[in-house]
Amino acid sequence: MADSMQLAGIVLAGGESRRMGRDKATLPGPRGAATLLEYVVGVLTQRCDPIFVMAAPGQPLPEVSARIIRDEIRGQGPLPATGRGLRAAAEAGARYAFVCAVDMPLLSPELIDDLVHLATETNAEVVLPWDGRSHYLASLYRTDLAERIDRLVAGGARSMRALIDASDAQQIVLPESRFLANVNTEADLRALAQARA
């Protein structure tokens, strides 16, 4: 693990995928991975242990080397799922967790290394990449933020921005932002496939 930090991985896979029209977790994966979920878990496995996949109730998932945690209620957004994942990571002894979306076909372990390095230097509660915009779902979060998330959710918050605004967050400017690309539509998927060809 980078900088010898105990680092968990959390993959948010339970989103509704409205723009895509089908479950992103089961989309074809890059570099020989059968699905996007398998690819993202494979990347996280290189830097994170344990790994948790946050999934919707009843959502079918491919077999992966990760613990599956089901949302209690469908469609609540990423904040409650992140809180449950951070709580599980804290219980497993991790101080930080890399939290990402399942729809990142160019994700790289080097991105995680860059975030861990800044977290080690600053002890920030959140370290997130910036490439003209903040990427909340490709960031490092301290696991002790689970309680704060519970309070935010109890107050009606559902977006990750609410957590960032209530935290000591540090941003890292990335010279190479392609690792942050995500797929939201069939056109995005085709464009990435063509770029890899």
Swiss-Prot record:
Give me any GO biological process, just one. Mo-molybdopterin cofactor biosynthetic process
Q: Where does GTP bind?
A: L12, A13, G14, K24, D71, D103
The UniProt record gives the binding positions of Mg(2+) as D103
Chemical reaction(s) catalysed: Mo-molybdopterin + GTP + H(+) = Mo-molybdopterin guanine dinucleotide + diphosphate
- Cysteine pairs forming cystine bridges in this chain are none
Question: Can you provide one Gene Ontology molecular function annotated for this UniProt record?
Answer: GTP binding
Report any Pfam family annotated for this entry: NTP_transf_3
Which SUPFAM superfamilies does the entry link to? Nucleotide-diphospho-sugar transferases
Which GO cellular component terms, listed alphabetically, does the Swiss-Prot or TrEMBL entry include? cytoplasm
Family that this chain belongs to: Belongs to the MobA family.
Reported function: Transfers a GMP moiety from GTP to Mo-molybdopterin (Mo-MPT) cofactor (Moco or molybdenum cofactor) to form Mo-molybdopterin guanine dinucleotide (Mo-MGD) cofactor.
Q: What is this protein called?
A: Probable molybdenum cofactor guanylyltransferase
Organism for this UniProt entry: Mycobacterium avium (strain 104)
**Per UniProt, what is the name of the gene that codes for the protein in this document?**
mobA
